[in-house]
Each structure stands twice: as C-alpha cells, then as structure tokens.
C-alpha cells in the first residue's frame, strides 16, 4: 500500500492485548525449540514450517527483479514506477521486437478492493505504477508508445499486514498458490519468439524489456501464512532491488534488510534510497555496499500529497536511467558468467569419482532450494528445477537453502568463527554432545569424538576398536608394529562389497575393487570379508538372496509376506538364524586358527551404500554382532550413510535391536550443509586410552575438530529431526517409514529389464538387469542423461540407480519424482 509521505496514520488497535507465554531464556541462539503446544496440529504446523519449497522455473529472456524494502512506507512503489518509466522509454527508443515487455507485478496488496482497482486508503500500487511509468513524451518525440503491464495477484481491503488482513476478512491465499500465480504470470509475460527470432537472439544480452515484482512491507514481513516473504519468494530467487530507508533510523533498518537477504542467498543487484531531511543515509551504507559490489542510487525526497509527482520523475529520469542500465548490466553479466562456467568448468575442476574423458554435460547450478537444484539451461535460456535425486551425495537432511539453518550457521560464525577444541568447551559442541548421547548413543555411549567427515570418523573408530581388543585380550601393541619381522597381524571383520571411505586405513577395510586397486600403491586388504544375505523386491515379493557359501545345505527361503516381516525379532529363533551363526563363527574361528587376530568388526548396518545399495538381512547382522561380542571383538557401526532418519528411523540400531561399541555419524548429522563427523564410544572403549602416558592417549585430530559452525549446524538439524519425529502419529502398521511408493517399486520389480528394487526410509533403489553388473558398468549412463534432461538429477552405482530425499520431504513429492523416474525409464526401454 502506497503512502506518499512515508508516514503512518495512527489507527486504533485491531486486537486487545493478550498475554503470550514467555519462553525460557537462552544464552545461545542455535537450534530450534519444539513447540510447547501439546496438540498434534501444533506439532504438524511447526514441522511444516521447517521445510523449504522446491525451485520455480523462470525465463531469462527478459530481466526480472524483485523489489524488497527495508521497511514499509519507504517508497518501493515510487522507485518501481521510476524504473518501469525508464525501461519503457528505453524500449520505445530502441523499438525492440523480442526484448519482452515492461511489467510490474504486485503479488500481495492490502488496502484495495478484491479486484485491485479501487483503493480504500490512497491509490493501489499497480495503478500508481501504471500512471507514472507510461511514456508521456511519445507525442512530442514521435516514439512508439510502450505500455507497462501492471497487475495485482491477490488483495485485501484492510490496510494492514497480509496475515492480519487475511484473518480479519476471512479469505486467504497459501504460499503455494501465491507462488504458482506468480510463476504463471512471469511465464505469460515472457516474449513468445519465433524460431527465427530465437536464432537471432543473443542469450547473453539483456533485452529492452524489464519485469519488477514488488513485495509488501519489509524483507521479513509475512505473507498470509505468516511466513517471512523473503523465505516464500526464495523458491524463485529473483535478483533484488532493495529500497533502503532514508529516514532517521533507516541506516540500521537498511543494513538489517540487506543482511536478511544475503543470509537467504539472494543476489542484491542495486539499492535505491529516497533521502529524507538531508540525512544522507546512503553515505553511511556505502562502505559496506562497496565491499559487496552493490551500487547505491539516491533520489531526493518526494513532495507531500496531494502534489503530483510528474515533475519529481522528470527531475529524476537520469537517475532511474542509470538504475535501469545497471540492472540490465547485472542481468547480462549473470548470463555471461553462466556461459563462462559452462565452457571452462571442465578445464579447471578435477571432479571426484569422474572419468573426465567421458564426462557428460556440465550442470550449471545457480542455487538450490528444498529438494531441488536451480539449473541454468542454455538451450532455453531459463533456470529450471532439477530434483536432487542423490541428495547431494546422500547428505541432504533439512533441504537446500533452509533459512533457519543459515541463521544458525551465521550466528555461530559471528560468535566464534573457529576456536581450538582440545581441553576447551564451547556451547555448540557441548550441546551437540549431549544431544548425541541422549539419542543415537542412548543406553550405550558416553563419549563423543569429533572429526571432519565419514572416512575420518571410521579411521578414529578403528583406532578405538583395535586398542580395546588389544587390551581386552592382554596383548602387547608393539607386536603389531610394522617394523617387527615377526609381527602379528590384526584385521577387521567386514562385509563383502563394503565401502567406508577414501583414507588409507579404511580403504584397507575393503576387498580389491574399482574403488582401490588403481588408487593407492599402499592399499592392502586387511580384513575378512563376509558375503551377506540381501533383501529386495523381486517379481513383486520380498526375497532374501543367500549366497551358497552361507546357506550350505539350507533350503531356499520362502518370500517374506511384507517388508516389516524382515525386521520381526521372532526370526531370531528361526533355523536361518542358526545357519547365519554357523557361517559367522566359522569365518572368525578359521581366521584366528591361522594366528591372525580379528581385532574389530565393521559393518554398514541395514543398508550398504557405495558397494551397490544392498539391503542386508538384519537377522544376519544381529547374529554377527552377537558372535563378535561373545569373543570380545569390538563392533563398529558405520552409520555415516544410514544414521539420522536416512532409513526412516533415527538410527539403524533401532532396526537391528542391538547396540554397537562404537558408531560413526556424518552426512545427515549436519543436515547436509557443512562437513563434520562424530564417533561415539562406550566408556569401556574410552577407558582403554585413559592412562598416565601421553602416548597412550588417542593421538588423532583435525584442525577444525568440533568447529562451532559445524556443531551449530548439527544441533539445528537434530532439533529439526526431533520436531519431525514429534509430529508423526505413532502407528503399529509399519515398523519402518518409507517415503517412496512401494506399490510402484513392486510393479517395477516384475519387469524383465529390472533385477531388483526396494525402498527404505528416504531411499529408493532400482537395479537394471545387465550382463556386466557392478560399479564399472555404463548401462545406466543413457538413462541418467535422459533423467537430467527431464528434471531429475540422478546418479548411479554402475547399473544400480537410486533416488533419495530428505527426512523433511513429503510423500507426495516423492511420488511425483518416482513417477517421473519410471516414465522416463519405460520410454527409454520402449525405444530399445
């Protein structure tokens, strides 16, 4: 709502004052506190507020900018009209056919009637822009009239904040509906080019058109849903024109608005400021904006109502022409940077797990939000959504671009930066340790050791386990030293096809494979690698595939009646449990009979990741742990992948029903935002390092151990997972929550070109039936490229394709993505 003098009339209060509960005082501001309301609806509402929407597509043929204000009544509409006025003049002068229109969109407007045409208080913003932005000089200069397309998408009569107007008037609009209206409007406004015009158009140059989307109030003013509009519009991430505050106190509000936008990942193309009372607020803002490369444009104060603004606009035409040129230069530079990355990325990067000689098309990721990347498409000159089907290498836990997470990280960076950890304590690390021990470590762990990533977490775990084994068995550590001619050998009991990371120690806990045989001359497999029984959907039913080495003379198992039956504890008394026990015991005993010590057991519980996405029969792993425990062999759970709701439960321990001695967590630990890992251990394990000699301490460490930003990210992520868990309705129907449509995967498993499928928690897996299966297989490469062209950023493990979401993703979204996946796969098969 436009108020010329940028002052507010005093209105009587619309509500009586109410007493709100006072939250407990906190001396830190990381993490989230669950709602104190006990109703399920309140819990669900808080859960819904955690999630970020996906990405909305829009064309880059015509530059589009979003106008935010550092407050209400500071001249957003006045500035918008000036920019549109300048753009119409430029468009008329150049007579561009394909540059697109000049347009102004007001998504939400209060203080007008529902049609947006009759103002209750003052003039509607769209009407104001339409009046002052038209080309009044066309008759004298003989230029073609270039109109401004002005529209209001949703409005209320009451001149208050949208959330309050919606409440008072009894009609509202959801954020999803608002974004859909806006995206559709932007699509309609884009120029409809002929093939000839598309060929002639320079995608790296801004046309003469320009579209402005003006927000309501300040940067964090709410939409009708009470969510900050800076969060709601983040799904588009349009570059911003920030209108600063020229009044007394406006320096602070302008700076705060700028920081609120930056922390949410917006690009600020320009700041416009209507100065008041000759305060020169721009001069105070300029040192910071200059550092950020953001130009500031200033205008003189506007005359008071009811004096018209025609002369004011004429006096400022040159300023607005500069603003418009700057915005178009920003747009052009953005497109040129996309092109530069597309051309040069492969020449400067060395991508992991990539054969550069066969690298495919580079995806230019402009940003990410929710479960999707915002990717630049040079062929259509658009930014479009691409579902992050690999959860950015299995890390995504709270959605990309989550503003609550961004705020927590900024707070920790501002309060601490990085501080030394040994013999020190800081709030983020202390709070995180308490949360870890009260959740995944509850009942068994007492110590938390921090490191950098999953691989190093497992390295630490192996050092812990071997020390525990050596002392428990009253051995001398020196007998395992590499400089001893007759040194004893100590190895790890692990699973065939396992993968625990890329550092040398954990590389050695893996069989010879494509992951290690040409990677390091010091690689030596130091383990007993047990083949594991695998669970999958085949021909529509859950089957357990048991290698003959395990099964012996045991008859083939009948298909299980349901997925939940896989985790039924009554299977512990089945004949199959005895078969598993005999196999594990024989593997350990036969190894130790040769004089080799089995000093630790290391397993990926339930789901093995990089080795091929295999669901391991939990009965087998439970038996393995029991056999190791009977022999005082420390057991490590590598939950780097499986931990923190990846499998639909907090920890794979919840599905196995048996505790480890040591466990490793990463990836989802920090919500997928920053790298960090934690290795949890029991007090018995800790005590094996508790001695008088420094040399007997755990001499392992990283420069950024327990860095505050990482700990703050983890605390925030764990709080979000807790809120998610609180909002769920307990059910006895399913032991494991699955986000993906099992019926679709069961049907897929009946196809002749599919070897197996399954889904557990946030993971869905489809293995193609091929002759040369394995990680080195290229059979899925064509399908991967087809999926990426059709909105799904998938990766594969050889012939095994998978999709992964975050714990905050809705099942409806998963169904949408899975449908797209299956459709593209079936179309490709039909062509063969």
Annotate each predicted stretch with a short phrase:
Residues 58-64, 78-177, 188, 192:
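N-terminal phosphate/diphosphate-binding loop that engages ATP/GTP or pyrophosphate donors
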């Amino acid at each position: 709502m436009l108020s010329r003098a940028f002052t507010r009339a005093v209105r009587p209060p619309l509500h009586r004052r109410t007493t709100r509960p006072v939250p407990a005082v906190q001396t830190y501001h990381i993490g989230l506190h669950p709602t104190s309301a006990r109703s399920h609806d309140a819990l669900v509402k808080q859960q819904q507020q955690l999630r970020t929407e996906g990405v909305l597509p829009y064309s880059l043929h015509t530059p589009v900018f979003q106008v935010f204000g550092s407050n209400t009544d500071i001249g957003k509409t006045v500035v918008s009209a000036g920019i549109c006025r300048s753009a119409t003049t430029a468009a008329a002068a150049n007579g561009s056919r394909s540059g697109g229109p000049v347009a102004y969109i007001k998504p939400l407007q209060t203080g007008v009637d529902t049609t947006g045409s009759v103002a209750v208080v003052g003039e509607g913003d769209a009407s104001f822009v339409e009046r002052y932005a038209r080309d009044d000089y066309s008759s004298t200069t003989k230029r073609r009239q270039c109109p401004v397309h002005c529209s209001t998408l949703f409005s209320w009569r009451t001149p208050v904040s949208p959330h309050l107007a919606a409440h008072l008037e009894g009609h509202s609009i959801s954020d999803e509906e608002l974004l859909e209206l806006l995206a559709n409007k932007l699509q309609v406004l884009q120029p409809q080019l002929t093939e000839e015009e598309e060929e002639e158009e320079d995608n790296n140059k801004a046309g003469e058109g320009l579209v402005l989307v003006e927000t309501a109030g300040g940067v964090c003013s709410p939409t009708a849903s009470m969510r900050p509009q800076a969060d709601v519009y983040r799904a588009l991430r349009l570059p911003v024109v920030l209108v600063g505050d020229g009044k007394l106190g406006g320096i602070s509000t302008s700076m705060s608005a700028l920081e609120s936008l930056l922390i949410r990942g917006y690009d600020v193309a320009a700041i416009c400021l209507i100065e008041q009372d000759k305060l020169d607020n721009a001069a105070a803002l300029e040192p910071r904006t200059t550092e950020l490369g953001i130009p500031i444009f200033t205008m003189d104060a506007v005359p008071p109502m009811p004096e018209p603004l025609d002369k004011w606009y004429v006096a400022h035409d040159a300023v607005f022409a500069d603003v418009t040129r700057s915005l178009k230069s920003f747009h052009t530079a953005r497109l040129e940077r996309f092109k530069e990355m597309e051309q040069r990325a492969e020449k400067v990067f060395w991508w992991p797990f990539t054969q550069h000689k066969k690298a495919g098309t580079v995806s230019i990721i402009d940003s990410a939000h929710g479960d999707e990347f915002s990717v630049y498409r040079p062929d259509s000159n658009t930014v479009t959504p691409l579902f992050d089907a690999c959860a950015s290498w299995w890390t995504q836990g709270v959605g990309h671009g989550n503003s609550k997470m961004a705020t927590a990280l900024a707070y920790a960076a501002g309060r601490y930066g990085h501080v030394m950890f040994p013999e020190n304590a800081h709030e983020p690390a202390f709070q995180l340790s308490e949360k870890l021990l009260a959740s995944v470590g509850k009942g068994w762990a007492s110590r938390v050791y921090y490191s950098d990533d999953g691989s190093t977490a497992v390295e630490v775990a192996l050092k812990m386990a071997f020390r525990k084994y050596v002392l428990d068995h009253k051995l001398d550590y020196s007998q395992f030293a590499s400089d001893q001619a007759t040194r004893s050998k100590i190895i790890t009991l692990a699973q065939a096809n396992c993968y625990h990371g890329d550092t040398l120690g954990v590389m050695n806990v893996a069989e010879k494979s494509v992951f290690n045989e040409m990677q390091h001359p010091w690689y030596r497999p130091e383990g007993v690698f047990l083949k594991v029984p695998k669970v999958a959907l085949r021909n529509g039913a859950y089957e357990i595939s048991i290698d003959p080495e395990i099964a012996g003379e045991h008859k083939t198992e009948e298909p299980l009646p349901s997925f939940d039956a896989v985790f039924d504890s009554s299977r512990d008394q089945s004949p199959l449990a005895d078969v598993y026990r005999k196999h594990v015991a024989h593997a350990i005993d036969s190894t130790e009979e040769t004089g080799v010590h089995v000093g630790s057991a290391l397993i990926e519980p339930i789901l093995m990741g990089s080795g091929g996405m295999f669901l391991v029969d939990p009965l087998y792993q439970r038996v393995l742990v029991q056999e190791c425990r009977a022999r005082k062999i420390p057991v490590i759970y590598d939950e780097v992948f499986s931990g923190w709701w990846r499998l639909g439960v907090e920890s794979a321990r919840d599905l196995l029903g048996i505790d480890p001695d040591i466990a490793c967590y990463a990836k989802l630990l920090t919500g997928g935002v920053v790298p960090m890992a934690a290795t949890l251990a029991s007090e018995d394990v800790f005590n094996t390092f508790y001695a008088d000699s420094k040399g007997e301490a755990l001499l392992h460490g990283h420069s950024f151990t327990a860095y505050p930003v990482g700990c703050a990210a983890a605390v925030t992520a764990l709080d979000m997972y807790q809120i998610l868990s609180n909002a769920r309705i307990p059910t006895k129907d399913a032991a494991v929550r699955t986000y993906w449509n099992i019926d679709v995967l069961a049907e897929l498993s009946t196809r002749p070109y599919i070897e197996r499928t399954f889904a557990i928690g946030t993971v869905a897996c489809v293995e193609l039936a091929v002759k040369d299966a394995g990680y080195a297989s290229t059979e899925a490469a064509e399908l991967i490229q087809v999926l990426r062209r059709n909105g799904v950023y998938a990766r594969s493990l050889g012939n095994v394709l998978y999709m992964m979401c975050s714990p905050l993703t809705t099942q409806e979204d998963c169904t949408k993505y899975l449908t797209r996946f299956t459709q593209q796969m079936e179309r490709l098969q039909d062509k063969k």
